[in-house]
Amino acid sequence: MTDWTAGYIADIGYTFGYYTELNPLRAQFALLYGGFAPPAGSACCELGFGQGVSVNVHAAASGSEWWATDFNPTQASFARELASVSGASANLSDESFEEFCRRQDLPDFDFIGLHGIWSWVSDKNRQVIVDFIRRKLKVGGVVYVSYNTQPGWAPMIPIRDLLTDHRDSMTAEGSGSVAQVGAALEFIERLLDVNPTYAKVNPLIVERIKQIKTQNRNYLAHEYFNRDWAPMSFSRMASWLDSAKISFAVSAAYLEQLDPMNLTKEQVA
């Protein structure tokens, strides 16, 4: 029997939230500030829409045509119900990336967005996504991708490995993701309480774990406990997307474009 989850957490749903960076109109402002002419945005796509809040808001509040998929049928069902009661005309499916990206009825897109997807899927799925962008993004189109970066996420890599190792070896398979997350976090906290050398070298990791423990367990399961989890450097990210014939334009976070707020005079020089 094929595991349709491909190692992704599926026994519990993702959290409900709106992600403003997926808004093509917001992307237009970032591009204009960076000196780029944005596309019209008449055809848009979201890969991995979660509970579908963002894609439904964007479909209902704009004249753009939206196509999107999320392989979790429970989340796709909720997103479709949200579309039916809101009047949003989004085309929503529960297909895997491989299934969705090979469809012949999809238009070419001005905007393709992925939020919380890239770092949490396999290399095989990343290649499917890159090939899809290469074939279906219009000339002059925009891709928004959020991902966990190196070196910022580097201290969390061994911690995350311990979390999943504890889940795989120390908890019952049928106990469910929420219980497994809680048990793994308790283990990490006990480990850090004895002040290992790793905590001395990375003092901020203790506070980070304390902060993580306060977060929603569904979010944590999807953030840290999938089979695939790959923070990567900017250069590696650029290398992945190079074959799709796209390159970095601007950050979706407006304030990151303001050098005086983020860099010293010496760093700017």
Provide a role label for each language-model segment:
Residues 11-42:
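Conserved alpha-helix/loop element of class I SAM-dependent methyltransferases that forms part
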Residues 65-70:
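Conserved SAM-binding motif I beta-strand of class I
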Residues 127-139:
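A short glycine-rich, Lys/Arg-flanked "PGG" loop and its adjoining helix->strand segment in the class I
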Residues 196-269:
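Rossmann-like AdoMet/SAM-dependent catalytic core
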